[in-house]
Amino acid sequence: MLLGFKEYETQAQHLAEALGLPYAMVGVHRFPDGESKVTLPGRLPVHVVFCRSLDHPDDKLIQLLLAATTARKLGAQRLTLVAPYLCYMRQDTAFAVGEAVSQPIIGRFLAGLFDDVITVDPHLHRTHDFADAVPAAHVMALSANAAMAEFLHSYRAAHYESHADIILLGPDSESKQWVRSLAEANGLEYGVAHKQRLGDREILVTLPDLDLVANTVVVVDDVISSGETIAVTARACLERGAKSVDVLVTHPLFAQGAIERLRQAGVGEIWSTDSIPHPSNCIVLTNLIAEAVQRIV
């Protein structure tokens, strides 16, 4: 059985259909004081798959704790969590005395609830093995690169004037693995910008030595939250003579005001996977995730 939650119900239902599993939605009622009442089906099979993306995570983590614990009491012996976007992976070290390091804390929390944890492109910087971040019995960190490369190939063939005038650009060093993979899959030129934080809100982006004049630039990243880095990068590309700047992202967190910030910076198209529901979703991850779940069912 696959259990989903309302805000991610469409993707969860599609995954259940792809796996041939019965689907049910976890009931979540919010009380006026902010507490949650979680309700599961009264009878559960031995193996239960939970599907929920963990953007805006704090309430969701508590609800998963309640749901997973209740599932065990109802007879489930193996619990699998499919979280296409996995929260709290970005902080893997303390930058000040007394600062909580969220990655291992949340990783151990999830490993204590679920036997298997499956995610897509977790934002791991200094942690090289996903199992070190989430020490569950079985973990899988899938890559959306193939699906994104296929989308980019189809889109450029249908919409761009030629293939030769497209350049892929990573906004910082952490994006290099994604932009390089997409460029190699599509036979495109790519580069990686250098990002420097000058303060809490000021970012300096230095573009690589690429000829952007009259070229279409596609900025590629794994996560966009505030959009500030991408906005600064887009402005720099347009100032150097780029014909247009589009954006391709795996996880569209898009905090309040992010889309407006990107538009004001001159960004044209914005494409994302459906790891987090958003109007920019155009790359479906169902098949990628279903194949991973089938390997452990």
Kindly label every feature range from the protein language model.
Residues 1-297:
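PRPP-associated nucleotide enzymes
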